Amino acid sequence: MLLALKITPQRSTQYAQLTASLAAPELLASPLHTMIHEVQPITLAGQSYLLATVDDTCLSDAMTVKILYRLGAISEVYEYFEQIGDVLGPLLRPVEPQFTSFVPLEMAEVRRYKGKTNEIFTRVLLNVALFAGNYANSSTQRIRILDPLAGGGTMLFAALASGYDAFGIELERQDVETTAVFVRQYLEGEHIHFREVDERARKAGRRYQFEVGSKGDTRHLVLVHGDCSAANLHMREVAGGPRVHAIVGDLPYGIQHFGEISDLLSRSLPIWEQMLLPGGTIALAWNATRIKRTEMMEVIQKGTQLQVRNDPPYTQFEHAVDRVIKKRDIIVAVKDI
Protein backbone atom coordinates (compact mmCIF):
# COMPACT_ATOMS: atom_id res chain seq x y z
CA MET A 1 0.00 0.00 0.00
CA LEU A 2 1.14 3.54 -0.76
CA LEU A 3 0.32 6.51 1.44
CA ALA A 4 0.78 10.15 0.43
CA LEU A 5 1.44 12.19 3.57
CA LYS A 6 1.10 15.92 3.01
CA ILE A 7 3.82 17.92 4.72
CA THR A 8 2.27 20.64 6.88
CA PRO A 9 2.17 23.87 4.82
CA GLN A 10 4.02 26.85 6.28
CA ARG A 11 3.83 30.61 5.89
CA SER A 12 7.40 31.01 4.63
CA THR A 13 9.96 29.13 2.57
CA GLN A 14 12.21 29.02 5.64
CA TYR A 15 9.65 27.14 7.73
CA ALA A 16 8.54 25.00 4.79
CA GLN A 17 12.10 23.68 4.45
CA LEU A 18 12.30 23.13 8.21
CA THR A 19 9.08 21.11 8.24
CA ALA A 20 10.09 19.06 5.20
CA SER A 21 13.38 18.10 6.86
CA LEU A 22 11.58 16.92 10.02
CA ALA A 23 8.78 14.93 8.39
CA ALA A 24 10.57 11.69 7.51
CA PRO A 25 12.49 11.21 10.78
CA GLU A 26 9.36 12.01 12.82
CA LEU A 27 7.40 9.38 10.87
CA LEU A 28 10.17 6.81 11.25
CA ALA A 29 10.44 7.47 14.99
CA SER A 30 6.73 6.73 15.43
CA PRO A 31 5.29 3.32 16.37
CA LEU A 32 4.42 2.92 12.68
CA HIS A 33 8.06 2.35 11.71
CA THR A 34 7.59 -1.44 11.77
CA MET A 35 4.95 -1.11 9.02
CA ILE A 36 7.00 1.18 6.76
CA HIS A 37 9.13 -0.27 3.97
CA GLU A 38 10.21 2.89 2.14
CA VAL A 39 9.77 6.66 2.40
CA GLN A 40 10.58 9.21 -0.29
CA PRO A 41 9.74 12.90 -0.81
CA ILE A 42 7.52 13.77 -3.77
CA THR A 43 5.72 16.84 -5.11
CA LEU A 44 2.07 16.68 -6.19
CA ALA A 45 0.38 19.76 -7.68
CA GLY A 46 3.11 21.95 -6.20
CA GLN A 47 2.67 20.55 -2.67
CA SER A 48 5.28 18.55 -0.75
CA TYR A 49 4.43 15.02 0.38
CA LEU A 50 6.10 11.91 1.73
CA LEU A 51 5.28 8.81 -0.28
CA ALA A 52 5.37 5.88 2.13
CA THR A 53 5.23 2.22 1.16
CA VAL A 54 3.51 0.48 4.07
CA ASP A 55 1.94 -2.83 5.05
CA ASP A 56 -1.46 -3.43 3.46
CA THR A 57 -2.99 -3.64 6.95
CA CYS A 58 -1.68 -0.22 7.97
CA LEU A 59 -5.04 1.59 7.87
CA SER A 60 -7.10 -1.20 9.41
CA ASP A 61 -6.21 -0.09 12.95
CA ALA A 62 -7.74 3.17 14.21
CA MET A 63 -4.70 3.74 16.47
CA THR A 64 -2.42 3.72 13.42
CA VAL A 65 -4.48 6.41 11.72
CA LYS A 66 -4.61 8.39 14.97
CA ILE A 67 -0.81 8.40 15.15
CA LEU A 68 -0.54 9.56 11.53
CA TYR A 69 -2.75 12.54 12.32
CA ARG A 70 -0.81 13.29 15.52
CA LEU A 71 2.36 13.91 13.53
CA GLY A 72 3.43 17.54 13.66
CA ALA A 73 5.09 17.68 10.24
CA ILE A 74 2.18 15.92 8.48
CA SER A 75 -1.19 17.62 7.98
CA GLU A 76 -3.17 15.26 5.70
CA VAL A 77 -3.12 11.54 4.89
CA TYR A 78 -4.16 9.93 1.59
CA GLU A 79 -4.07 6.55 -0.04
CA TYR A 80 -2.02 6.89 -3.23
CA PHE A 81 -2.84 5.14 -6.51
CA GLU A 82 -0.88 5.24 -9.75
CA GLN A 83 -4.01 4.13 -11.60
CA ILE A 84 -7.57 3.03 -10.86
CA GLY A 85 -9.14 1.04 -13.67
CA ASP A 86 -8.59 2.99 -16.86
CA VAL A 87 -8.00 6.24 -15.03
CA LEU A 88 -4.34 7.21 -14.82
CA GLY A 89 -3.06 8.83 -11.66
CA PRO A 90 -1.65 9.83 -9.43
CA LEU A 91 -4.95 9.61 -7.55
CA LEU A 92 -5.46 10.32 -3.86
CA ARG A 93 -8.17 9.03 -1.52
CA PRO A 94 -8.44 10.94 1.77
CA VAL A 95 -8.02 8.92 4.96
CA GLU A 96 -10.54 9.98 7.59
CA PRO A 97 -8.84 11.50 10.67
CA GLN A 98 -9.10 9.51 13.91
CA PHE A 99 -7.60 12.24 16.08
CA THR A 100 -9.48 15.15 17.65
CA SER A 101 -7.40 17.67 19.56
CA PHE A 102 -8.40 18.34 23.17
CA VAL A 103 -8.15 22.08 22.58
CA PRO A 104 -7.64 23.66 19.14
CA LEU A 105 -4.13 23.21 17.76
CA GLU A 106 -4.17 26.93 17.01
CA MET A 107 -3.72 27.63 20.72
CA ALA A 108 -0.01 26.99 20.15
CA GLU A 109 -0.03 29.09 16.98
CA VAL A 110 -1.92 32.30 17.72
CA ARG A 111 0.27 33.69 20.49
CA ARG A 112 3.30 35.58 19.15
CA TYR A 113 6.19 36.58 21.37
CA LYS A 114 9.93 37.16 21.14
CA GLY A 115 11.93 33.95 21.11
CA LYS A 116 8.95 31.72 20.33
CA THR A 117 9.78 28.26 18.98
CA ASN A 118 7.94 27.30 15.79
CA GLU A 119 4.79 25.39 16.78
CA ILE A 120 5.30 22.64 14.17
CA PHE A 121 8.78 21.94 15.50
CA THR A 122 7.33 22.00 19.02
CA ARG A 123 4.81 19.29 18.12
CA VAL A 124 7.54 17.21 16.46
CA LEU A 125 9.75 17.49 19.56
CA LEU A 126 6.85 16.46 21.79
CA ASN A 127 5.99 13.48 19.59
CA VAL A 128 9.59 12.30 19.35
CA ALA A 129 9.88 12.39 23.15
CA LEU A 130 6.89 10.08 23.56
CA PHE A 131 7.72 7.86 20.58
CA ALA A 132 11.13 7.03 22.08
CA GLY A 133 9.77 5.81 25.40
CA ASN A 134 7.25 3.37 26.76
CA TYR A 135 4.12 5.51 26.38
CA ALA A 136 3.76 6.11 22.63
CA ASN A 137 0.58 4.02 22.40
CA SER A 138 -0.72 4.51 25.92
CA SER A 139 -4.51 4.65 26.02
CA THR A 140 -4.92 3.75 29.68
CA GLN A 141 -2.86 6.52 31.32
CA ARG A 142 -3.15 10.29 31.52
CA ILE A 143 0.14 11.37 29.96
CA ARG A 144 1.97 14.07 31.93
CA ILE A 145 4.40 16.41 30.15
CA LEU A 146 6.83 18.81 31.83
CA ASP A 147 8.55 21.67 30.02
CA PRO A 148 11.11 22.96 32.52
CA LEU A 149 12.02 25.87 30.21
CA ALA A 150 8.48 26.87 29.35
CA GLY A 151 8.97 30.43 28.06
CA GLY A 152 5.65 31.59 26.61
CA GLY A 153 4.02 28.17 26.83
CA THR A 154 4.05 26.87 23.24
CA MET A 155 5.02 23.34 24.35
CA LEU A 156 2.33 23.37 27.03
CA PHE A 157 -0.36 24.30 24.54
CA ALA A 158 0.81 21.62 22.10
CA ALA A 159 0.71 19.03 24.90
CA LEU A 160 -2.76 20.14 26.01
CA ALA A 161 -4.03 19.92 22.41
CA SER A 162 -2.76 16.32 22.32
CA GLY A 163 -4.82 15.55 25.41
CA TYR A 164 -1.93 15.50 27.90
CA ASP A 165 -1.59 17.15 31.29
CA ALA A 166 0.90 19.99 30.76
CA PHE A 167 3.23 21.47 33.38
CA GLY A 168 5.64 24.33 32.75
CA ILE A 169 8.38 25.97 34.81
CA GLU A 170 9.80 29.35 33.80
CA LEU A 171 12.41 31.53 35.52
CA GLU A 172 11.10 34.84 34.11
CA ARG A 173 8.13 35.85 36.24
CA GLN A 174 6.73 38.19 33.60
CA ASP A 175 6.59 35.34 31.07
CA VAL A 176 4.62 33.23 33.54
CA GLU A 177 2.16 36.02 34.29
CA THR A 178 1.56 37.03 30.66
CA THR A 179 1.14 33.38 29.66
CA ALA A 180 -1.48 32.91 32.39
CA VAL A 181 -3.34 35.96 31.06
CA PHE A 182 -3.25 34.51 27.54
CA VAL A 183 -4.57 31.15 28.75
CA ARG A 184 -7.57 32.80 30.42
CA GLN A 185 -8.33 35.00 27.43
CA TYR A 186 -7.96 32.21 24.88
CA LEU A 187 -10.08 29.66 26.73
CA GLU A 188 -12.78 32.23 27.43
CA GLY A 189 -12.74 33.41 23.80
CA GLU A 190 -13.10 29.84 22.52
CA HIS A 191 -15.80 29.06 25.10
CA ILE A 192 -13.71 26.21 26.54
CA HIS A 193 -14.69 25.40 30.11
CA PHE A 194 -11.95 25.86 32.71
CA ARG A 195 -11.42 26.77 36.32
CA GLU A 196 -8.45 27.99 38.28
CA VAL A 197 -7.38 26.21 41.43
CA ASP A 198 -4.80 26.98 44.15
CA GLU A 199 -5.76 30.64 44.59
CA ARG A 200 -3.14 31.33 47.28
CA ALA A 201 -0.22 30.33 45.04
CA ARG A 202 -1.71 32.35 42.17
CA LYS A 203 -1.98 35.50 44.28
CA ALA A 204 1.63 35.06 45.36
CA GLY A 205 2.62 34.93 41.68
CA ARG A 206 4.25 31.54 42.08
CA ARG A 207 1.91 29.11 40.37
CA TYR A 208 -1.12 29.16 38.10
CA GLN A 209 -3.16 25.95 37.91
CA PHE A 210 -5.92 25.52 35.35
CA GLU A 211 -8.31 22.61 35.08
CA VAL A 212 -9.41 22.63 31.44
CA GLY A 213 -12.42 20.83 29.98
CA SER A 214 -15.88 19.73 30.99
CA LYS A 215 -16.54 17.73 34.14
CA GLY A 216 -15.43 14.13 33.70
CA ASP A 217 -13.01 14.99 30.88
CA THR A 218 -10.49 17.51 32.15
CA ARG A 219 -6.76 18.12 31.80
CA HIS A 220 -4.33 20.07 33.97
CA LEU A 221 -2.38 23.07 32.68
CA VAL A 222 0.07 24.41 35.26
CA LEU A 223 2.48 27.37 35.03
CA VAL A 224 5.14 27.74 37.73
CA HIS A 225 7.54 30.60 38.35
CA GLY A 226 10.86 29.05 39.38
CA ASP A 227 14.19 27.50 38.48
CA CYS A 228 14.23 24.39 36.29
CA SER A 229 16.84 22.74 38.49
CA ALA A 230 14.32 22.70 41.36
CA ALA A 231 11.55 21.20 39.23
CA ASN A 232 10.78 18.45 41.74
CA LEU A 233 10.12 21.00 44.48
CA HIS A 234 7.93 23.15 42.25
CA MET A 235 5.89 20.11 41.20
CA ARG A 236 5.31 18.66 44.68
CA GLU A 237 2.08 20.54 45.27
CA VAL A 238 0.53 20.28 41.80
CA ALA A 239 -2.11 17.74 40.84
CA GLY A 240 -0.55 14.28 40.60
CA GLY A 241 2.76 15.27 42.16
CA PRO A 242 6.21 15.48 40.53
CA ARG A 243 6.27 12.30 38.41
CA VAL A 244 5.92 12.72 34.64
CA HIS A 245 6.07 10.61 31.48
CA ALA A 246 8.26 13.01 29.48
CA ILE A 247 10.34 16.12 30.04
CA VAL A 248 10.56 18.16 26.87
CA GLY A 249 12.32 21.48 26.42
CA ASP A 250 13.98 23.87 24.04
CA LEU A 251 17.28 25.04 25.53
CA PRO A 252 17.98 28.81 25.35
CA TYR A 253 19.35 29.74 21.93
CA GLY A 254 21.18 32.78 23.23
CA ILE A 255 23.71 30.54 24.98
CA GLN A 256 26.65 30.21 22.61
CA HIS A 257 29.13 28.38 24.80
CA PHE A 258 28.86 24.81 26.00
CA GLY A 259 29.99 25.69 29.52
CA GLU A 260 26.72 27.52 30.23
CA ILE A 261 24.57 24.70 28.82
CA SER A 262 26.69 22.14 30.67
CA ASP A 263 26.20 23.97 33.97
CA LEU A 264 22.44 24.23 33.45
CA LEU A 265 22.11 20.55 32.56
CA SER A 266 24.51 19.32 35.24
CA ARG A 267 22.32 20.98 37.89
CA SER A 268 19.02 19.90 36.36
CA LEU A 269 19.39 16.47 34.78
CA PRO A 270 19.71 14.42 38.01
CA ILE A 271 16.50 16.06 39.29
CA TRP A 272 14.68 15.51 36.00
CA GLU A 273 15.76 11.88 35.92
CA GLN A 274 14.20 11.31 39.36
CA MET A 275 10.92 12.79 38.13
CA LEU A 276 10.61 10.48 35.13
CA LEU A 277 8.39 7.44 35.37
CA PRO A 278 10.01 4.15 34.25
CA GLY A 279 10.21 4.16 30.46
CA GLY A 280 9.89 7.94 30.40
CA THR A 281 12.01 10.24 28.28
CA ILE A 282 13.84 13.53 28.17
CA ALA A 283 13.92 15.29 24.79
CA LEU A 284 15.87 18.52 24.39
CA ALA A 285 16.40 20.80 21.42
CA TRP A 286 19.47 23.01 21.28
CA ASN A 287 21.40 25.39 19.06
CA ALA A 288 23.86 22.97 17.46
CA THR A 289 25.69 25.68 15.52
CA ARG A 290 28.50 25.70 18.09
CA ILE A 291 27.60 22.92 20.51
CA LYS A 292 28.24 19.41 19.21
CA ARG A 293 25.97 16.42 19.68
CA THR A 294 28.81 14.49 21.31
CA GLU A 295 29.08 17.19 23.98
CA MET A 296 25.37 16.95 24.72
CA MET A 297 25.59 13.16 24.93
CA GLU A 298 28.51 13.37 27.31
CA VAL A 299 26.78 15.65 29.81
CA ILE A 300 23.66 13.44 29.85
CA GLN A 301 25.66 10.24 30.26
CA LYS A 302 27.86 11.78 32.96
CA GLY A 303 24.97 13.09 35.06
CA THR A 304 22.34 10.35 34.66
CA GLN A 305 21.70 6.67 34.00
CA LEU A 306 19.50 7.54 31.01
CA GLN A 307 20.09 5.82 27.68
CA VAL A 308 20.70 8.31 24.86
CA ARG A 309 19.05 7.33 21.59
CA ASN A 310 21.98 7.73 19.21
CA ASP A 311 20.51 5.59 16.44
CA PRO A 312 18.49 6.59 13.35
CA PRO A 313 16.08 8.29 13.08
CA TYR A 314 16.98 10.04 16.35
CA THR A 315 20.26 11.22 14.81
CA GLN A 316 18.50 12.70 11.76
CA PHE A 317 16.68 15.73 13.16
CA GLU A 318 19.44 18.30 12.58
CA HIS A 319 18.09 21.23 10.53
CA ALA A 320 18.60 24.92 9.80
CA VAL A 321 16.42 27.49 11.55
CA ASP A 322 17.57 30.90 10.30
CA ARG A 323 20.71 32.90 9.50
CA VAL A 324 21.78 32.97 13.13
CA ILE A 325 20.86 29.41 14.14
CA LYS A 326 22.33 27.50 11.23
CA LYS A 327 21.88 24.14 12.99
CA ARG A 328 19.36 22.98 15.57
CA ASP A 329 19.17 19.40 16.77
CA ILE A 330 17.24 17.12 19.12
CA ILE A 331 18.66 14.69 21.67
CA VAL A 332 16.49 12.05 23.34
CA ALA A 333 17.30 9.94 26.41
CA VAL A 334 15.20 7.16 27.93
CA LYS A 335 14.82 5.91 31.50
CA ASP A 336 14.93 2.15 31.98
CA ILE A 337 11.66 0.37 32.70
Could you tell me what each predicted segment is?
Residues 21-94:
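N-terminal accessory interaction module
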